[in-house]
């Protein structure tokens, strides 16, 4: 539930390596 400061509209979350995932076009972690 914490925004990672990255959007995932056009590309996947680069921050996924830090545990972030795409939700509603924004990368979140927990």
UniProtKB/Swiss-Prot annotation:
The keyword Membrane does not apply. InterPro entries: Cyclotide, Cyclotide_bracelet_CS, Cyclotide_sf. There is a cross-link at residues 1-30 (Cyclopeptide (Gly-Asn)). GO terms for biological process: defense response; regulation of defense response to virus. Disulfide bonds join 4-20, 8-22, 13-27. This is a cyclic peptide. Keywords: Antiviral protein, Disulfide bond, Knottin, Plant defense. Belongs to the cyclotide family. Bracelet subfamily. Probably participates in a plant defense mechanism. Inhibits the cytopathic effects of the human immunodeficiency virus. The presence of a 'disulfide through disulfide knot' structurally defines this protein as a knottin. This is Circulin-C. It comes from Chassalia parviflora.
């Amino acid at each position: 539930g914490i925004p990672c400061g990255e959007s995932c509209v056009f590309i996947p979350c680069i921050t996924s390596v830090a545990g972030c995932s795409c939700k509603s076009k924004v990368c979140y972690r927990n």
